[in-house]
């Protein structure tokens, strides 16, 4: 097992990374009160719920469960209310812990519930997908979607602990594993050229589900994110770099309908669009652009999206949370392994980069 810490002063918390982790031992110091609400989905209820219920009962905890349907399209106000209903029906108080057992959707919703129930209760993250292990479970961003934009309603809520168990990735469908690799590739492109080389060497093993390689990828990804979050918790500056590919990607997700494409798939194509624009601006070479496309393709991820009318694509981009004073800001690549956030780019070049990476209209 490897351990990282997100350094946030008195809110410092650990990330445990390994296989066959023991929840009873690892969670014991971090669950403050007796009451624990496990929030999970219908898929994970069958796979892992009993394991964690048993561990919590062994710690003499009062356990209740809220099971939500599985999928991004359920990340909305109606299903968030089901968590509040469960907390209130169980009679839980402000010393309770909300434990997220699931991927990014469950983590985002359970975290938002923990941030808002009785103005804030304890929160624990047990991410069960690669994407949530390397990204959404770390850093405290929580929230739900709105028909006009992804993650538009939410709060910052840091967990007490994150427990990433590689053995749970065995049950992950290949498409979900690939979606998680999009966020892993993101960390390499935005800040670590050596990590990009490591991914190029080991991509076949990662796709095959090698737990040792996956643990290393999760550790290196979380180390990047933990450092950035410690420096910029509320995304006033450097943390926005973690949105490489996301402005384009969120537009793709919003247009196609949440859940039609997985988040990681949309981010993958979004990163290609960002790299394409960076190339058009003269910042990266054509070889760098091809290298970006190749590593994304090797992870079995898309490098183009279905045809989307340009005016609608741009409209969704205008709802992005990085828009400041009416100006769109993009995360682009100054070089491979070095990203910047900028509002200085040629809009016509941006439009060309979007259109060039859509599947043929014919």
UniProtKB/Swiss-Prot annotation:
Binding annotation for NAD(+): 70-75, 104-108, 128-129, 141, 150
Catalysis performed (reactions): 7-phospho-2-dehydro-3-deoxy-D-arabino-heptonate = 3-dehydroquinate + phosphate
InterPro entries: Dehydroquinate_synthase, DHQ_synth_AroB, DHQ_synth_fam, DHQS/DOIS_N, DHQS_C
Pfam families named in the record: DHQ_synthase, DHQS_C
E.C. number(s) listed in UniProt: 4.2.3.4
UniProt pathway: Metabolic intermediate biosynthesis; chorismate biosynthesis; chorismate from D-erythrose 4-phosphate and phosphoenolpyruvate: step 2/7
Keyword Zinc: yes
Cofactor needs: Co(2+); Zn(2+); NAD(+)
GO cellular component, one term: cytoplasm
GO biological process, one term: aromatic amino acid family biosynthetic process
Alphabetical keyword list: Amino-acid biosynthesis, Aromatic amino acid biosynthesis, Cobalt, Cytoplasm, Lyase, Metal-binding, NAD, Nucleotide-binding, Zinc
Example of a GO MF term: nucleotide binding
Binding site for Zn(2+): 183, 246, 263
Main location (coarse class): cytoplasm
Family: Belongs to the sugar phosphate cyclases superfamily. Dehydroquinate synthase family.
Function in brief: Catalyzes the conversion of 3-deoxy-D-arabino-heptulosonate 7-phosphate (DAHP) to dehydroquinate (DHQ).
HAMAP family, per the entry: DHQ_synthase
Protein name per the record: 3-dehydroquinate synthase
């Amino acid at each position: 097992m490897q351990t990282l810490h997100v350094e946030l002063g008195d809110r410092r918390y650990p990330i445990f990374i390994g296989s066959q982790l023991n929840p009873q031992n690892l969670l014991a110091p971090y669950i403050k009160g007796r009451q624990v609400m496990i929030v999970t989905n219908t898929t994970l209820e069958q796979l892992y719920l009993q394991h964690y219920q048993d561990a919590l009962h062994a710690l003499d905890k009062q356990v209740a469960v809220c099971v939500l349907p599985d999928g991004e399209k359920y990340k909305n106000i109606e299903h968030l209310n089901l968590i509040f209903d469960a907390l209130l029906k169980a009679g839980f108080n402000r010393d309770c812990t909300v434990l997220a057992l699931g991927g990014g959707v469950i983590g985002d919703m359970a975290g938002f519930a923990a941030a808002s129930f009785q103005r804030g209760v304890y929160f624990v993250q047990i991410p069960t997908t690669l994407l949530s292990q390397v990204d959404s479970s770390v850093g405290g961003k929580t929230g739900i979607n709105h028909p006009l934009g992804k993650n538009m309603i939410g709060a910052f809520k840091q967990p007490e602990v994150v427990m990433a168990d590689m053995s749970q990735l065995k049950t992950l469908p290949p498409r979900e594993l690939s979606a998680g690799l999009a966020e892993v590739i993101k960390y390499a492109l935005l800040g670590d050229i050596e990590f990009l080389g490591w991914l190029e060497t080991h991509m076949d093993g990662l796709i095959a589900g090698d737990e040792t390689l996956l643990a290393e990828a999760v550790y290196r990804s979380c180390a990047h994110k933990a450092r950035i979050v410690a420096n910029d918790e509320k995304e006033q500056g450097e943390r926005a770099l973690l949105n490489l590919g996301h402005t384009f990607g969120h537009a793709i997700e919003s247009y196609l309908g949440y859940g039609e494409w997985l988040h990681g798939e949309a981010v993958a194509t979004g990163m290609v669009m960002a790299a394409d624009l960076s190339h058009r601006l003269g910042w990266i070479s054509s070889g760098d652009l091809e290298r970006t496309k190749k590593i994304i393709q090797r992870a079995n991820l898309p490098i183009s999206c279905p045809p989307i009318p340009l005016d609608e694509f741009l409209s969704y981009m205008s709802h992005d949370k990085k828009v400041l004073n009416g100006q769109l800001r993009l995360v682009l690549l100054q070089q491979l392994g070095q990203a910047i956030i900028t509002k200085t780019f040629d809009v016509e070049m941006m439009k060309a980069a979007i259109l060039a990476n859509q599947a043929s209209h014919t």
